[in-house]
Amino acid sequence: MADHSFSDGVPSDSVEAAKNASNTEKLTDQVMQNPRVLAALQERLDNVPHTPSSYIETLPKAVKRRINALKQLQVRCAHIEAKFYEEVHDLERKYAALYQPLFDKRREFITGDVEPTDAESEWHSENEEEEKLAGDMKSKVVVTEKAAATAEEPDPKGIPEFWFTIFRNVDMLSELVQEYDEPILKHLQDIKVKFSDPGQPMSFVLEFHFEPNDYFTNSVLTKTYKMKSEPDKADPFSFEGPEIVDCDGCTIDWKKGKNVTVKTIKKKQKHKGRGTVRTITKQVPNESFFNFFNPLKASGDGESLDEDSEFTLASDFEIGHFFRERIVPRAVLYFTGEAIEDDDNFEEGEEGEEEELEGDEEGEDEDDAEINPKV
């Protein structure tokens, strides 16, 4: 009997496997030429989440090597940017000296130490004509009250409660102020910003100048904010300019019984053996704006702060930055409320742009939607 297990020296099962492979390739070619199959495959590929990192992983080693070179260049750019911001800080210091005579005069007008001249107090409002018309109408209505109108108006010294009014107008600050803080803040006469000396680490100091009062003996309360303008070695690509990294307050020399940052509570204690009861008093922290001068310290020993402490510290940094960049340079506009209106309008404009963009996107999806023009 002939042996059929081999054909021309090739095992029969190998021949069968080759035939199956050939048939599989032909079937695959036929399937891949089917438009419906291709469309289904494309749809599945489109639904697969795509991330930049997943794309980078697919690149050849030679391309990845060049990308690493680009990252090296980016780090060098970050260090150049850090030097740029250091020079900006030097410029801020230079121009702060030019602003200061104007701020000193502002303080004199606020405190009433100096009365502005007619030329210095002349100001033309954008709504001057409307105000004049309203004044004319009012004068016609109150003709019968001329006698009362001629009475001398009160003329307080300077601009009373100037800085306290700013605290009330600005939400970020008013949220910190308690009712018992208010009479103290009415003694606030000036807020100044002082920059670090040339060659010293970047920092700025907020100075709160108070007139003599019944609450503490300090004439000036200070808050120092320390800054850093260098890329983080662990994450150099996160660098976006100088950042506040820590702050120091000052000791407030409170007069007896006037410290609003603590409150006294009474607590009864019962002796376990004798059963006698005694009342003890102790001081506990109290919410107050003046806790601003006793801030949390940023962790410098490598230990991370808890979430609440991190939030408190970040809020403190934000307030310090706001005093420096907004409140002190534009104080009169926060007193009148004009700067607050500008801030609100800017925020509303941003929201409006987002809503308009969302509407445009919806319109693109609904190609058949009916358009109803507004008349």
UniProtKB/Swiss-Prot annotation:
Tissue: Ubiquitous. Biallelically expressed in fetal and adult tissues. Highest levels in testis.
Region of interest: Disordered: 1-31, 116-137, 339-375
Modified residues (Phosphoserine): S5, S7, S12, S53, S54, S125, S304
Gene3D superfamilies according to UniProt: 1.20.5.1500, Nucleosome assembly protein
One GO process term, biological-process aspect: nucleosome assembly
Keywords: Acetylation, Chaperone, Cytoplasm, Nucleus, Phosphoprotein
Predominant localisation class: nucleus
Compartmental location: Nucleus; Cytoplasm
Compositional bias (Basic and acidic residues): 121-137
Record PTM Phosphothreonine, positions in chain: T51, T58
Compositional bias annotation for Polar residues: 20-31
GO cellular component: chromatin; cytoplasm; dendrite; neuronal cell body; nucleus
Modified-residue entries (N-acetylalanine), positions: A2
InterPro entries named in the record: NAP-like_sf, NAP_family
Record note on modification: Phosphorylated at the G0/G1 boundary but it is not phosphorylated in S-phase. Phosphorylated protein remains in the cytoplasm in a complex with histones during the G0/G1 transition, whereas dephosphorylation triggers its transport into the nucleus at the G1/S-boundary. Polyglutamylated by TTLL4, a modification that occurs exclusively on glutamate residues and results in polyglutamate chains on the gamma-carboxyl group. Some residues may also be monoglycylated but not polyglycylated due to the absence of functional TTLL10 in human.
Modified residues (N6-acetyllysine): K105, K146
Location of the motif Nuclear localization signal: 265-271
GO molecular-function terms, A-Z: chromatin binding; histone binding; nucleosome binding; RNA binding; unfolded protein binding
Quaternary context: Interacts with core (H2A, CD2APH2B, H3, H4) and linker (H1) histones.
Function: Acts as a histone chaperone in nucleosome assembly.
PANTHER family to which the protein is assigned, alphabetical: TESTIS-SPECIFIC Y-ENCODED PROTEIN
Family recorded in the similarity comment: Belongs to the nucleosome assembly protein (NAP) family.
Protein name stated in the entry: Nucleosome assembly protein 1-like 4
Protein's organism: Homo sapiens
